[in-house]
A protein has these predicted regions:
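Structural/interface elements that position substrates and couple domains in central-metabolism enzymes
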Residues: 1-142
Length: 142
């Protein structure tokens, strides 16, 4: 279901899957833990990749060598460029309290999906982000 919501967000923005890059913020199964077992991120990434979407991951709690080969691992967010959507997958402090202004400048369009409902979406919207969240209708921020 979440994969289809993300595809809908991208489609409504006029993006085709083949040219789209998504950045996962977090990968582990719960916040502040470096354990990738049973993570919902892996099947979500696979579902997006099956649609032709490229997936990058930033998770400072997990050893970069343990990620699947199919994802692009980013260890420094200043290197995260050209993404069309950031997805907060895990509510690590490092993923919630990051430099959102800096990340916005590196993205094709500052667009975020809060999969944990922990971000201050109002502040992000004031800073120019298009914000979406689990449980929030897509039409709230066109």
């Amino acid at each position: 279901h979440v994969a289809q919501v993300l595809v809908d967000i991208l489609w409504k923005a006029g993006l085709s899957a083949e040219s789209t890059k998504v950045l996962f913020l977090g990968w582990s199964y719960k916040a502040e833990v470096g354990d990738p077992r049973e993570t919902p991120a892996e099947p979500l990434a696979e579902a997006l990749q099956q649609r032709g979407i490229s997936v990058s991951v930033y998770d400072p709690h997990i050893d970069p060598e343990t990620f699947p080969d199919s994802v692009d691992v980013i260890t420094d967010l200043t290197q995260a460029t050209g993404h069309h959507l950031a997805v907060l997958v895990t509510a690590h402090k490092a993923c919630v309290d990051l430099d959102w202004d800096g990340l916005a400048l590196q993205m094709e369009t500052p667009r975020v999906y809060d999969g944990r409902r922990v971000l201050d979406l109002e502040s992000l919207e004031e800073a120019g982000w298009q914000c979406f969240a689990v449980g929030r209708p897509l039409g709230v921020n066109p």
